[in-house]
Amino acid sequence: MNSKLVLLVVGVVFALVLVIGRQGGVVAPQSISVSPQMSTAAPVAAPIAFPQATNVAMAVEPMAAAGGTVAAMESPLPNFVPRNLKVFEGHWQGMDGRLMTEELARKLNYPRGVQGVLLGEVTLNAAFSGLLGGDVVVRIDDTPVTNMENFQAATRNVANRSEARISVIRKDNRPGTPVLRKLTVVLRAAEGGLGFAQLEGAPMILPGDPRPHGYRGACTDCHPVGQGFELSPDPDLISLPPSAITRDAVTRGVSPHEVRGPCEACHVIN
C-alpha cells in the first residue's frame, strides 16, 4: 500500500513539473549556452553615399561577407580631370566652330593645308551675316585665325565693337575637285558689343569607353574621364507622352496630325 502511495505522489509531482514548464516556468541559467560571438553586437555600417562627381578618392569601410570573412567593397573610381585639356570647340555670336584638322579636311573633301576654324553650325547673328555651316574662318578683321586660341584672341580685339569683318573660305559642294572661294562678311551686334568667343573642351567619357574616332593621341589629352559632368539622360532624347483626348474626338476622326495609326496606340482616351 505504501509503495502505491509513493508512486502516486511521484506521478503527481512529475505532472505538475510538466504543466509548469509548458506555461513558461523559470528556466535555470545553466540551461542557456551563450556563444561569445553572439554576446557582442556587430557594428552596423553607416550608408555610404557616392557622389557622381568628385576628384578625391573615397575611403570605403570593409564589410563582412556571408562566409564570415571581411571583404573590401570596390569603390568607384574618382573622376579624372586633367589640368591641361586641348580645346575642342568655340562659340561666338551664333558660330559653333572647331579646329580644322587634316582628319576633318580629308573627311569633308577640303584641300590639305587649310587652316582655321571650321563652322559646324551657325545661328543668330552669324546666320544673319551670311555665314554658312562648312565655312572656315581664317581672319577676323586684321588678325589671322589658325587655331582655337587665336580665334578667341581675335574676338577679344573686337569684343567692344558693334561690327567686325569675318574672312572665310567656302567650299563648293559640287562633287569632284574642291573649289574654294574666299569671302568676307560683316558680323554685326545690335547692342552690347560682339563679346568674345567662349572655348570648351571635349565631353567627359566613361572609363574604358570605345573610341568613336581615329587615333588622336591619349584620350586624356582631350577628355575628362568619369561621370557627372553631363546631364543624363539628354532631355532632347526624351519623348513625352501625348495628351489625353476625348472619345468624341476619336469618333469624329478629329486629329491635329496626319494618320499615324489608331488613336489609342498613343493617347489616353477619356
Swiss-Prot record:
GO terms for cellular component: plasma membrane
Annotated segments matching region PDZ: 84-201
EC number in record: 1.-.-.-
Residues the entry annotates as binding heme 1: C219, C222, H223
Keyword Nucleotide-binding: no
Iron in keyword set: yes
Subcellular location(s) of the protein: Cell inner membrane
Positions in the Lumenal compartment: 21-270
Membrane topology type: Single-pass membrane protein
Cytoplasmic domain ranges by topology: 1-6
InterPro entries reported for this sequence: MCR (IPR040963), PDZ_sf (IPR036034)
Binding, heme 2: C263, C266, H267
Cofactor: heme
PTM statement from Swiss-Prot or TrEMBL: Subject to proteolytic cleavage which requires both MamE and MamO.
Cofactor binding remark: Binds 2 heme groups via the magnetochrome (MCR) motifs.
UniProt cross-references to SUPFAM superfamilies, sorted A to Z: PDZ domain-like
Knockout consequences: Intermediate magnetic response, few large magnetosomes with magnetite, makes many very small, irregular hematite crystals. Near wild-type localization of MamC. Deletion of approximately 80 kb of DNA, including this operon, leads to cells that are non-magnetic, lack internal membrane systems, grow poorly, have reduced mobility and take-up and accumulate iron poorly.
Gene3D superfamilies: 2.30.42.60
UniProt keyword terms in alphabetical order: Biomineralization, Cell inner membrane, Cell membrane, Heme, Iron, Membrane, Metal-binding, Oxidoreductase, Transmembrane, Transmembrane helix
Induction, per UniProt: Part of the probable 17 gene mamAB operon.
Job of this protein: Involved in redox-control of magnetite formation. Oxidizes Fe(2+) at alkaline pH; successively forms ferrihydrite (Fe(3+)(2)O(3) 0.5 H(2)O) then magnetite (Fe(3)O(4)) from an Fe(2+) solution.
Family label: Belongs to the magnetosome MamP family.
Free-text comment about domains: The dimer forms a pocket of about 8 X 15 Angstroms, lined with acidic residues, which may bind 2 Fe(2+) ions.
Other known facts: This bacteria makes up to 60 cubo-octahedral magnetosomes of about 45 nm in diameter which contain membrane-bound crystals of magnetite (Fe(3)O(4)). Expression of just the minimal mamAB gene cluster (MGMSRv2__2365 to MGMSRv2__2381), including this gene, is sufficient to form a minimal magnetosome chain with small magnetite particles.
Protein name: Multi-heme protein MamP
Species annotation: Magnetospirillum gryphiswaldense (strain DSM 6361 / JCM 21280 / NBRC 15271 / MSR-1)
